Amino acid sequence: MRLFGLILAGGEGRRMGGTDKASLTLGGRLLVTWVAERLGPQVEELAISANGDPARFAGLGLPVLRDEHPQGPLSGVLAGLRWAAAAGADALVTAPVDTPFVPGDLAPRLWLAGEGACAVAEAGGRVHPACGLWPVAVAEDLAAWLAAGEARVMGFAARHGAARAGFPDENAFLNLNAPEDLARAESLLRKDA
Ligand SMILES: Nc1nc2c(ncn2[C@@H]2O[C@H](COP(=O)(O)OP(=O)(O)OP(=O)(O)O)[C@@H](O)[C@H]2O)c(=O)[nH]1
Ligand SMILES: [Mg+2]
């Protein structure tokens, strides 16, 4: 089984005041670095899904994949699936750049839950579909789904009967959408220290 990984960082961060969330720091480290360090060891190859100037990620040494048509996170998933398929991977594991505490066993648990088919993460009764596993075989169906104007990750997961992989720690999926979420993540870090 060849699993590739993708950090979703193609959003505009409007709730964060229009900041590129990848460039925010938590505990003195870039958010994109947090996610790269957690997801990278779980996959064979890792890339970043982002629009705008790719030079801002040069320090990470990872491929940067642009959306063909930015239409939400699924546009990034499609670019990632095409990249993974071209390199002979079986599936892509995605995690958003604003989820710094993403579990170190995300990929294997998603893989086990879905037995290689689509799977999404769940913790504390909430589903986190941007933390998901997508077989390369769904790429063209995703392209058609996006072309039909659909954009919801949860909707696409449901369309493929995605399995749910349960995780014990809700904080692992803490999503930094607004400045107060970043403050909460900083306070969790201080508690752990
Ligand atoms: N490739 C790609 N990723 C996206 C797109 N829109 C959102 N994302 C990513 O999907 C994840 C979840 O999106 P949000 O939490 O809404 O982030 P966002 O869109 O940057 O923030 P808001 O503008 O406040 O909604 C984040 O990691 C985003 O970077 C897009 O059009 N293309
Ligand atoms: Mg958004």
Swiss-Prot record:
InterPro entries: MobA-like_NTP_Trfase, Molybde_CF_guanTrfase, Nucleotide-diphossugar_trans. Its cofactor is Mg(2+). GTP binds at residues 8-10, 21, 67, 98. Its EC number is 2.7.7.77. It is an enzyme of class 2 (transferase). It comes from the Bacteria. GO terms for molecular function: GTP binding; metal ion binding; molybdenum cofactor guanylyltransferase activity. Keywords: Cytoplasm, GTP-binding, Magnesium, Metal-binding, Molybdenum cofactor biosynthesis, Nucleotide-binding, Transferase. The keyword Cytoplasm applies. Its main location: cytoplasm. Mg(2+) binds at residue 98. It is found in: Cytoplasm. Coiled coil: none annotated. It catalyses: Mo-molybdopterin + GTP + H(+) = Mo-molybdopterin guanine dinucleotide + diphosphate. One of its GO terms (biological process) is bis(molybdopterin guanine dinucleotide)molybdenum biosynthetic process. One of its GO terms (cellular component) is cytoplasm. The N-terminal domain determines nucleotide recognition and specific binding, while the C-terminal domain determines the specific binding to the target protein. HAMAP family: MobA (MF_00316). Belongs to the MobA family. Transfers a GMP moiety from GTP to Mo-molybdopterin (Mo-MPT) cofactor (Moco or molybdenum cofactor) to form Mo-molybdopterin guanine dinucleotide (Mo-MGD) cofactor. Monomer. This is Molybdenum cofactor guanylyltransferase. The lineage of its organism: Bacteria, Pseudomonadati, Pseudomonadota, Alphaproteobacteria, Rhodobacterales.
